[in-house]
């Protein structure tokens, strides 16, 4: 039944009467701020809602200041098209099995005045849009057994008992500003989407406060998950968690760092490219959009763009540092080194962004510019030659390469330079001028190199230039006794 076809209060009342098996309720209609017609139900009785009798309906219904009981344990799967809202209600019992809610399902401003309160359970259910807003739950909240939720939005709730998500599929979750006074479980579940990147899942746990133990055991996070400014006061368990994209733990507070379990956390998917992608995918936030709205000045636009990129790079660096410090507190230096490597990735990207900003500034501090450039090149070289001392194969390849290169230098000296030794001896007086010329040339390359965006190209050129200097010094000192001793 569609409200657009002229559903009146009487027809809606008959539907609700059959659904709740009572006529003792008041019904009214009103429009919300989006001009959508909502039917409000108020009653002093306990309304025992039969969801099977709502399958064919399609309208917005709000139970307000009612006592609700929903018990649906049938093996038969049903779909509910209508939008169900529960405002300022109390729940005697909710246990729902095998129901797919196509519309919105919302519980707000819950009032628990009952002496006996049972758990709120959803098993083998599916939700398109689930909202829990400004509630104080005295019940255990349980989502179990492959319940699928495309969007779950929890805002300013207080959970006095357990909050439980196990073996569920969560597309998007927003846990902003919730207070969990008892244990929380987000176990054996999948957050985000495995393959479909166009869904753009949002996994936001930020600003939540966990006063008791919280467990994320064996869960998979397929998209960016945001834990920034979360407070964890007791045991925090990430055992067996896998992050497919870069997580954000910036400004997280762990009251007991030694109570944080990071055993078997899988971050193999995280590398320098994932750090770059995180910044590119996230810097265009609401603040960025507000600042650049209607802007025509390209220079100012570029400045704001890099300011926000820099902010996200710094936040990411702090995020990796937080986990690194926790692991160091636990004397787990091996795992801490992995997170330190990610921290250096973020630092390199921060320097890169800083460098692009300084390149465009007219009155930039040249000395500071040189330091940023040099740090950026060094981090790039370390990353590509040894992955910041974490990749033995890269270190071995680089070492073997240097030995081979040294052998080539020796061969070059013996085979090519010997016949021209007299000529080189005549150039001894001009050595200092040649070295100065090389340094000036390097400075010119640093400030006017066309491929400013390619730090890797600069690093390669830097290495080649250094090799050139070494070759010249080898040539110059070839005839001295000291060099012959080295050979």
Per-segment meaning from a language model:
Residues 1-487:
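Terminal module of membrane-associated proteins
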């Amino acid at each position: 039944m569609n409200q657009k076809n002229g559903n009146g209060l009487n027809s809606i009342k008959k539907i609700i009467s059959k659904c709740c098996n009572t006529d003792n309720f008041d019904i009214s209609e009103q429009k919300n701020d989006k001009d959508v017609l909502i039917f409000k139900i108020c009653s002093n009785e306990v309304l025992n809602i039969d969801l099977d009798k709502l399958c064919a309906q399609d309208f917005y219904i709000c139970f307000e200041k009612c006592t609700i009981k929903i018990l649906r344990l049938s093996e038969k799967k049903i779909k509910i098209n209508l939008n169900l809202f529960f405002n300022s209600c109390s729940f005697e019992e909710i246990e729902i099995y095998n129901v797919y809610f196509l519309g919105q399902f919302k519980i707000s401003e819950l009032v628990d005045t009952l002496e006996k309160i049972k758990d709120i359970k959803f098993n083998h259910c599916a939700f398109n849009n689930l909202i829990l807003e400004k509630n104080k739950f005295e019940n255990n909240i349980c989502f179990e057994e492959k319940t699928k939720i495309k969007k779950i939005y929890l805002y300013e709730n207080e959970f006095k008992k357990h909050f439980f998500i196990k073996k569920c599929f969560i597309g998007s979750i927003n846990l902003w500003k919730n207070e969990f006074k008892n244990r929380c479980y987000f176990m054996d579940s999948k957050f985000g989407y495995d393959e479909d990147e166009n869904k753009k899942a949002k996994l936001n746990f930020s600003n939540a406060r966990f006063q008791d133990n919280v467990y994320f055991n064996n869960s998979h996070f397929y998209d960016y998950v945001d834990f920034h400014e979360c407070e964890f006061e007791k045991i925090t368990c990430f055992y067996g968690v896998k992050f497919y994209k870069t997580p954000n733990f910036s400004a997280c507070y762990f009251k007991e760092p030694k109570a944080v379990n990071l055993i078997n956390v899988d971050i193999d998917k995280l590398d320098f490219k994932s750090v770059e992608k995180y910044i590119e995918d996230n810097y265009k936030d609401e603040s960025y959009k507000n600042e650049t709205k209607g802007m025509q000045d390209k220079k100012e636009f570029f400045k704001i763009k890099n300011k926000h990129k820099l902010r996200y790079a710094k936040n990411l660096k702090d995020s990796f540092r937080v986990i690194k410090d926790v692991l160091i507190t636990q004397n787990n230096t091996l795992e801490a080194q992995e997170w330190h490597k990610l921290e250096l990735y973020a630092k390199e990207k921060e320097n890169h962004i800083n460098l692009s900003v300084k390149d465009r500034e007219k009155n930039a501090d040249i000395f500071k510019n040189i330091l940023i450039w040099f740090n950026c090149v060094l981090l790039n070289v370390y990353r590509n030659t040894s992955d910041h001392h974490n990749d033995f194969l890269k270190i071995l390849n680089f070492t073997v390469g240097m030995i081979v290169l040294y052998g080539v230098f020796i061969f070059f000296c013996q085979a090519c330079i010997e016949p021209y030794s007299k000529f080189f001896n005549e150039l001894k007086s001009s050595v200092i001028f040649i070295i100065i010329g090389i340094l000036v040339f390097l400075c010119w390359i640093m400030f006017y190199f066309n491929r400013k965006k390619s730090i890797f190209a600069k690093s390669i050129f830097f290495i080649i230039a250094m090799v050139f200097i070494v070759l010249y010094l080898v040539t110059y000192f070839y005839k001295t006794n000291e060099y012959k001793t080295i050979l």
